[in-house]
């Protein structure tokens, strides 16, 4: 059975059991700072399990793209060396949100494995938590698994509920026992059943984990039963495929065999069992899907993990003898294997290959040199000693070698690495990274009240709003006094809280003698708006009723920029291509700053086309329309979902002109309200990411007027109409070039004339050699050199030293020696001798040298010393 069939049968089976098939979520967890990458099927349902989010369904099934590389869950160093470790894998799962529980979960799993996949029942073993009699009885009495193949696993990790068969999301929160299903490969494979001393062998392989969330654990460790227990299951596609295809290693399944063959093709390797081919085949999956989800190789965060994986693959290619770019050529093979299941891969395949090709080129420039440095360092390491941290850091900092890549190479050579030394060298960078990753001060404030009702789509002023919480310096208080900075939470507000790149509103909260100036609005928790500012007058208490008034002018400017951003995004995709995806944005009253995926600078023509498209939509003055609908319906209707944003089952869809996006921000009523759109800058911010800044409305008008003033001034200076300025400037440039050429010719003639005079008046003879040393005023260094060349030809055999002092106090020196004398006198030595006396340095060839200095007062004596210096050397 092919891997694609296994995946399809799994989803179809659970769909037949009333489950909704939910597409794989992004590898970038939405709004979850605790995870670097999505690493299991339950990640996208985390808020559903904890009760923070409701879905339209209670049963779900998915095939979730997952990555374990970096952070707590990191399999990177084992990939390629074991049968079952991967950076990228697919997790098949079924989930119940307070619907069915253990009985159905166990029965569904058994039915799928034995009736759909037709695995022999006698090959399946199960484990249950030691105290989970309910699960044990279902397996034994209802499913009919013999007692000898049901194993109870207790608290085997040193603490209460610390067990391979007890799962918990965190130290507190939902948790519960789990039941794992194992497949017995048979006695010809070494290993024992789970819980035995030989459990680490490959005979008994876990293929499915059924988690039963039935408790809520508090900070004291107390367990309370959940009123609506849930089910979370996970089965690795690669593992079940190995079982169904009768192989013992995941790398032997059909999907990997085709990728390994492709890697062998691109590296010229004949031995398909080579571990390096396994590494490359695994890594192309992780790298491609990370790029699909918007991650670009970089030196921080998720981008750095991607860079590490790419470079590890390239290093293994280099190890196989492939020193030219090859990794990106595996993308079509990956699309052939996985593009049907994940159409998002096929849609951006060209972009994926392009990003990988650029990273290959970037690393290829340093790989060979870095390997020489590493090989040299390893050759000096004494037996039993580690590679020092300084070398590790040099390879990382100078040659782009991720430290785990270096450690990987060292492991192959039997050498440990000095991680402590490396960490010491990295301390400053780590501190900077930690500082950059901190939350804003307002986020995460303790709050247990109702969410804030947002009324700001329709109104900028709202009376009768009630204060539900107050905070001063992060501490919840009952009252705020005049002059204090504070955060105010209201039951309802017209103030927009910063989200989706749009800045928060400012304005006033007032009542009687109370006046609170709102400087910013942020969400302190999902759905809870914190109004940051200063109490300018009065005393403010929890429970007070206020009038909330948004700064209307500032909001109007902000919404113009936000609506223009939507139109610009659509226009960029039309002009540059569908690969353009938002990578970040900032929308404030002054501008819109938009980061997007694109690999080359935009041309002036492309920018002009974007401006024309957006302004055409503005002039059309179409009404904007916002609708609330189901997420699936919105996407089917063509709404664009933005990278990195988290969406619930119900979303707000904004139609503005020819653009349709999911957006919770505030916008203009009609496109004409934008007034005018103008791009003011375009540039790169990272590899594969460009940034546009644009302005709208009165800001755009003021910018155009300022440009017009500058244009008119330039026209006045050049005495030409504005529309003729390009031609007039070109004429002036040509005239300038001609004048510069004439000036150069005049200088040359003047220098020749001066040289003739010098030859006649300043030359002395020393032991049959003509010596000329003179200072000739302010002469261009280039002309000075020409004079020395002419004098050498005229006086030979000769030694010539000319000096020129400029008006700004700089001295230029040029020395020349005819070829027949360079065996005894070097021009470089001569110039160095003179330059040292005037506070400078000099040097050059034996026959011609240049130098300089700054001490004009010492120049006459320095020039006069040349004759004696030459005499001493002849």
Curated annotation (Swiss-Prot):
Free-text comment on the cofactor: Binds 1 zinc ion per subunit.
Chief location of this protein within or outside the cell: cytoplasm
UniProt: Zn(2+) binding residues: 562, 566, 663, 667
Record InterPro entries: aa-tRNA-synth_II/BPL/LPL, Ala-tRNA-lgiase_IIc, Ala-tRNA-ligase_IIc_anticod-bd, Ala-tRNA-synth_IIc_core, Ala-tRNA-synth_IIc_N, Ala-tRNA_ligase, Ala_tRNA_ligase_euk/bac, DHHA1_dom
Top-rank lineage group of the source organism: Bacteria
GO molecular function per UniProt: alanine-tRNA ligase activity; aminoacyl-tRNA deacylase activity; ATP binding; tRNA binding; zinc ion binding
Reaction(s) the record says it catalyses: tRNA(Ala) + L-alanine + ATP = L-alanyl-tRNA(Ala) + AMP + diphosphate
Pfam families found in the cross-reference section: DHHA1 (PF02272), tRNA-synt_2c (PF01411), tRNA_SAD (PF07973)
EC number assigned by the record: 6.1.1.7
GO cellular component terms listed in the entry, alphabetical order: cytosol
Localization: Cytoplasm
Co-factor(s): Zn(2+)
GO biological process per UniProt: alanyl-tRNA aminoacylation; negative regulation of DNA-templated transcription
Keywords: Aminoacyl-tRNA synthetase, ATP-binding, Cytoplasm, Ligase, Metal-binding, Nucleotide-binding, Protein biosynthesis, RNA-binding, tRNA-binding, Zinc
Family assignment from sequence similarity: Belongs to the class-II aminoacyl-tRNA synthetase family.
UniProt cross-references to PANTHER family, sorted A to Z: ALANINE--TRNA LIGASE, CYTOPLASMIC, ALANYL-TRNA SYNTHETASE
Record's function text: Catalyzes the attachment of alanine to tRNA(Ala) in a two-step reaction: alanine is first activated by ATP to form Ala-AMP and then transferred to the acceptor end of tRNA(Ala). Also edits incorrectly charged Ser-tRNA(Ala) and Gly-tRNA(Ala) via its editing domain.
HAMAP family the UniProt entry points to: Ala_tRNA_synth_B
Free-text note on domains in this protein's UniProt record: Consists of three domains; the N-terminal catalytic domain, the editing domain and the C-terminal C-Ala domain. The editing domain removes incorrectly charged amino acids, while the C-Ala domain, along with tRNA(Ala), serves as a bridge to cooperatively bring together the editing and aminoacylation centers thus stimulating deacylation of misacylated tRNAs.
Protein name in the entry: Alanine--tRNA ligase
């Amino acid at each position: 059975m092919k891997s694609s069939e296994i995946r399809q049968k799994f989803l179809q089976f659970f769909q037949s059991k009333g489950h909704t098939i939910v597409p794989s979520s992004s590898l970038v967890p939405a709004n979850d700072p605790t995870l670097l990458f999505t690493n299991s099927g339950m990640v996208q349902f985390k808020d559903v399990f904890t009760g923070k989010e409701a879905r339209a369904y209670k049963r779900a099934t998915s095939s979730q793209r997952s990555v374990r590389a970096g952070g707590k869950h990191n399999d990177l160093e084992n990939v390629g060396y074991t049968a079952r470790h991967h950076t990228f894998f697919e997790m098949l799962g079924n989930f119940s949100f307070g619907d069915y529980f253990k009985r159905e979960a166990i029965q569904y799993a058994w039915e799928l494995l034995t009736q759909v996949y037709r695995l022999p029942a006698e090959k399946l073993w199960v484990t249950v938590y030691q105290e989970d009699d309910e699960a044990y009885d279902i397996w034994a009495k209802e499913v009919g698994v013999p007692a000898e193949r049901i194993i109870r696993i207790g608290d085997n990790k040193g603490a209460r509920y610390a067990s391979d068969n007890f799962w918990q999301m965190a130290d507190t929160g939902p948790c519960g026992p789990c039941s794992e299903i194992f497949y017995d490969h048979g006695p010809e494979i070494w290993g024992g059943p789970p819980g035995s001393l030989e459990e680490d062998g490959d005979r008994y392989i876990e293929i499915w984990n059924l988690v039963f969330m039935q408790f809520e654990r508090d900070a004291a460790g107390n367990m309370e039963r959940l009123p609506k227990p849930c089910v979370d299951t996970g089965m690795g596609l690669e593992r079940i495929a190995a079982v169904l295809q009768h192989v013992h290693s995941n790398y032997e399944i059909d999907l990997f065999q085709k990728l390994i063959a492709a890697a062998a093709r691109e590296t010229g390797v004949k031995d398909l069992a080579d571990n390096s081919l396994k590494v490359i085949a695994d890594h192309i999956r992780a790298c491609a899907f990370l790029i699909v989800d918007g991650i670009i190789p970089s030196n921080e965060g998720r981008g750095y993990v991607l860079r590490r994986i790419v470079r590890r693959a390239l290093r293994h290619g280099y190890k196989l003898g492939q020193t030219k770019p090859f990794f990106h050529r595996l993308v079509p093979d990956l699309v052939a294997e996985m593009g049907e299941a994940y159409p998002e891969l096929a849609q951006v395949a060209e972009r994926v290959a392009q990003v990988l090709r650029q990273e290959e080129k970037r690393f290829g420039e340093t790989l060979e040199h870095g390997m020489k440095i590493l090989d040299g360092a390893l050759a000096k390491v004494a037996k039993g000693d580690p590679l020092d941290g300084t070398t590790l850091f040099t390879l990382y900092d100078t040659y782009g070698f991720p430290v785990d890549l270096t450690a990987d190479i060292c492991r192959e050579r039997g050498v440990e690495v000095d991680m402590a030394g490396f960490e010491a060298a990295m301390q400053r960078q780590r501190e900077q990274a930690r500082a950059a990753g901190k939350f804003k001060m307002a986020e995460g404030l303790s709050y247990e009240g109702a969410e804030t009702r947002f009324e700001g789509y329709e109104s900028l002023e709202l009376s009768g709003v009630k204060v539900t919480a107050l905070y001063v310096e992060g501490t919840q208080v009952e009252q705020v006094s005049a002059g204090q900075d504070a955060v105010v939470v209201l039951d309802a507000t017209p103030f927009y809280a910063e989200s989706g790149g749009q800045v928060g509103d400012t304005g006033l909260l007032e009542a009687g003698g109370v006046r609170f100036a709102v400087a910013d609005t942020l969400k302190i928790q999902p759905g809870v708006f914190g109004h940051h500012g200063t109490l300018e007058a009065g005393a403010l208490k929890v429970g007070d009723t206020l009038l909330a008034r948004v700064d209307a002018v500032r909001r109007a400017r902000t919404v113009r920029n936000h609506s223009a951003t939507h139109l610009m995004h659509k226009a960029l995709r039309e002009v540059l291509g569908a690969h353009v995806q938002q990578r970040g944005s900032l929308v404030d009253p002054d501008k819109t700053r938009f980061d997007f995926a694109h690999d080359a600078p935009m041309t002036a023509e492309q920018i002009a086309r974007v401006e024309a498209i957006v302004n055409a939509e503005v002039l059309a003055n179409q009404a904007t329309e916002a609708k609330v609908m189901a997420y699936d319906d919105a996407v089917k209707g063509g709404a664009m979902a933005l990278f990195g944003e988290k969406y619930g089952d119900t979303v707000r869809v904004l139609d503005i002109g020819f653009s349709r996006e999911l957006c919770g921000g505030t916008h203009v009523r009609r496109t004409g309200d934008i007034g005018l759109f103008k791009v003011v800058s375009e540039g790169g911010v990272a590899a594969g990411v460009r940034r546009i800044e644009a302005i709208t409305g009165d800001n755009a008008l003021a910018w155009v007027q300022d440009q017009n003033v500058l244009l008119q001034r330039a026209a006045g200076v050049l005495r030409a109409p504005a529309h003729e300025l390009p031609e007039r400037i070109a004429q002036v440039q040509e005239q300038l070039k001609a004048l510069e050429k004439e000036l150069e010719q005049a200088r040359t003639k003047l220098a020749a004339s001066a040289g003739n005079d010098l030859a006649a008046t300043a030359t002395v003879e020393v032991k049959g050699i003509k010596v000329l040393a003179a200072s000739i005023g302010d002469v261009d260094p280039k002309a000075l050199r020409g004079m020395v060349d002419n004098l050498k030809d005229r006086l030979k055999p000769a030694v010539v030293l000319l000096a020129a002092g400029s008006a700004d106090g700089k001295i230029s020196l040029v020395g020349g020696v005819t070829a027949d004398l360079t065996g005894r006198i070097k021009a470089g030595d001569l110039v160095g001798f003179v330059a040292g006396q005037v506070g400078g340095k000099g040097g050059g060839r034996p026959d011609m040298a240049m130098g300089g200095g700054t001490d004009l007062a010492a120049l006459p004596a320095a020039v006069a010393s040349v004759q004696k210096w030459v005499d001493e050397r002849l």
